[in-house]
Amino acid sequence: MRICVILLLSFIFTETRLQVSNERFNTLLSSYVDSAGNVNYKGIIDNPFALNDYLKFIKEISPKSHPSYFDTNNSIKAYWINVYNAIILKLMIDNPGENILDIGYVGHDVFLKKFKIGGEKLSPLYIENKILRKMNDPRIHFAINCASKSCPPLGNRILVEENLDFQLNEKAILFINNPENVFIDYKENVIYLNRIFKWFKKDFGDLKIYIFKYLKNHNYDEVKDFKIKFFKYDWSKNSTNE
């Protein structure tokens, strides 16, 4: 009986910590990320408590280490998206610079930097490719942020299990209907796409069919034979005027 009570109290305590850490991280995002996804990094540097609290929590708790707290696919997916965005923020505030590729690693190797998550050491690249992409939901690419202007914007709220599909659809619509990410040139018969569609084409499948699931005010039949070209990727920092 005593063991059952202890286990129950432990479960409640951890679940409460998860809720509190999520709420604090959500408050941080709403305070320091504007509606366009620009981040006030200086504000987070000056007030890092919420981010550090969240990072401290995820060091111990993950869907792998504590599966009983993550009993749906959406709860797992939301967790890993939030974790990815949190550790990218941590990289940026610990290494202020013009862009993420300026951080003291060799080029894209910055994404190999490992963080302790649920007792394991995992990198952003591992989380993206070995966890999130394995979930077979291309919308995750519109929810994770690499601290760069061409990257899908960092939202000013966390992803939550209950509203995850709505949030991911919202992010897909926002990204695809931004002409900086999807632009149709009717004179040249070309569709210009953000380079993430090239990098992760395997996830999206037929690119024209995929974008027209979310693209408004255009007719698929008018452009189905257009060529596809890709914008140059802008790695400059997604920061506000700090």
Task: Indicate residue ranges for each PLM-predicted region.
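Sec-dependent N-terminal signal peptides
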Residues: 3-14
